[in-house]
């Protein structure tokens, strides 16, 4: 249970090490993560911190949410995200506090969650990397079909989970154990080594890695 950040995917670029090695990185804008609520066991049954990211016009905020944000003294955000944390860490924060890129360190391993790019309705070749049929040699109108999807009268049905055509992408994806290559505190940017799911401008959630031995 660790505090994380909400960010916006800016895009990809590369940086160079002192040895001249090229490192592909994804740039994340994590500016203005504002604490809107601190939940405690006494009042909510668990301990967590809620943060707001981005900005939104007041006319686009519902009255209950506007009252919730006004109570915390925080400007309306584009998105609200809750992070489960320990009570000791929650006690160090207060409503209206700003959490920034300095929450992480260079070299730290993080998990990044985003929504993958939607591809629409896709066939089995694109969706599951199936092989296509022969182009010639007697093959007619069966070049990109998946083939048989079942058996005969027994069992007389298609087994659940059979890989077939369908919607591809636009699902929540978490990439684990990515390394923070660089932090630009002035511009409030995180440069994370490797690719991150989602399109440019998409929202992502960055948290300390949970499955790496010795992760900070």
UniProtKB/Swiss-Prot annotation:
User: Is Magnesium tagged as a keyword?
Assistant: no
Q: How is it modified after translation?
A: Methylated by PrmB.
One GO cellular-component annotation of the UniProt record comes to:
cytosolic large ribosomal subunit
User: Superkingdom of the source?
Assistant: Bacteria
Per UniProt, the keywords (alphabetical) are: Methylation, Ribonucleoprotein, Ribosomal protein, RNA-binding, rRNA-binding
Query: Which family is this protein grouped under?
Result: Belongs to the universal ribosomal protein uL3 family.
The N5-methylglutamine modification is found at 153
Protein name as catalogued: Large ribosomal subunit protein uL3
Query: What subunit structure does UniProt give?
Result: Part of the 50S ribosomal subunit. Forms a cluster with proteins L14 and L19.
């Amino acid at each position: 249970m660790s505090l994380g950040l909400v960010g916006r995917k800016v895009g990809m670029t590369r940086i160079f090490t002192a040895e001249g090695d090229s490192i592909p990185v994804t740039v994340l804008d994590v500016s203005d993560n504002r604490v809107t609520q601190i939940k405690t066991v006494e009042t909510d049954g668990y301990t967590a911190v809620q943060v707001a990211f981005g900005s939104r016009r007041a006319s686009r905020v519902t009255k209950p949410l506007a009252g919730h944000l006004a109570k915390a003294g925080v400007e309306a955000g584009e998105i609200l995200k809750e992070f489960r944390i320990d009570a000791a860490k929650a006690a160090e924060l207060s409503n209206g506090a700003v959490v920034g890129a300095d929450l992480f360190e260079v070299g730290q391993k993080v998990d990044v969650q985003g929504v993958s790019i939607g591809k629409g309705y896709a066939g089995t070749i694109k969706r599951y990397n199936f092989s296509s049929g022969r182009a010639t040699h007697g093959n007619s109108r069966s070049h990109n079909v998946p083939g048989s999807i079942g058996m005969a009268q027994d069992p007389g049905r298609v087994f659940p989970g059979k890989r077939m055509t369908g919607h591809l992408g636009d699902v929540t994806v978490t990439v684990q154990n990515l390394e923070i290559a660089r932090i630009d505190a002035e511009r409030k940017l995180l440069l994370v080594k490797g690719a991150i799911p989602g399109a440019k401008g998409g929202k992502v959630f960055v948290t300390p890695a949970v499955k790496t031995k010795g992760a900070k």
